[in-house]
Amino acid sequence: MVDREQLVQKARLAEQAERYDDMAAAMKAVTELNEALSNEERNLLSVAYKNVVGARRSSWRVISSIEQKTSADGNEKKIEMVRAYREKIEKELEAVCQDVLNLLDNFLIKNCSETQYESKVFYLKMKGDYYRYLAEVATGEKRATVVESSEKAYSEAHEISKEHMQPTHPIRLGLALNYSVFYYEIQNAPEQACHLAKTAFDDAIAELDTLNEDSYKDSTLIMQLLRDNLTLWTSDQQDDDGGEGNN
């Protein structure tokens, strides 16, 4: 029998050493014990996989950019090598996302009780995020399918958060941040993205007195990111340059 506390301890240690693959493996094992995760464990799982997938997303962007430049050069051998390397990174990225989505569907979302709104929103947001990461690299029908799954998870989380969480709650704000990025970058719907981000920001500003002392720093940081994105997206719409949001 694997000791749960030892696994969590290993994840904490791996995080300090910035060994995120080890951290993710430890938290995957904790999740597969099929017991509800504490807030700390939930965050450890999220941080681990965000770093594991983040490294692949970053590599994929770099190689995709090189691939576009190489295609323009017309060197067939080099084009083939770059394409093969992009596909390798893509497969790794897809495997990580699938890992997380399986944990969410088979354990985490499934085991949330009706009234565990915070956990439910946290995990549904995560589900939306990982389908969004798949959408970044997918094409054609495959892309349409993962985009739809991402939208569905974000939308469900959004409804629950509006009904059961304070507008200043960091999880509700974080969801609005990522959902709006989904509209802007994946759906190419800047108006919806701006509307969602602005509403979340304004609602939080209107209820600043409800800010929990423990989450003050988290909430205000996300509000700042929402505002930064709004500024960027509004200026992008004016000069139509396109651009990436914070996520």
Swiss-Prot record:
The gene is ywhag-b. Disulfide bonds: none annotated. Keywords: Cytoplasm. SUPFAM superfamilies: 14-3-3 protein. The record marks R57, R132 as: Interaction with phosphoserine on interacting protein. Belongs to the 14-3-3 family. InterPro entries: 14-3-3, 14-3-3_CS, 14-3-3_dom_sf, 14-3-3_domain. PANTHER family: 14-3-3 PROTEIN. This is 14-3-3 protein gamma-B. Homodimer, and heterodimer with other family members. It is found in: Cytoplasm. PROSITE patterns: 1433_1, 1433_2. Signal peptide: none annotated. It holds the Pfam family 14-3-3. GO terms for molecular function: phosphorylation-dependent protein binding; protein kinase C binding; protein sequestering activity.
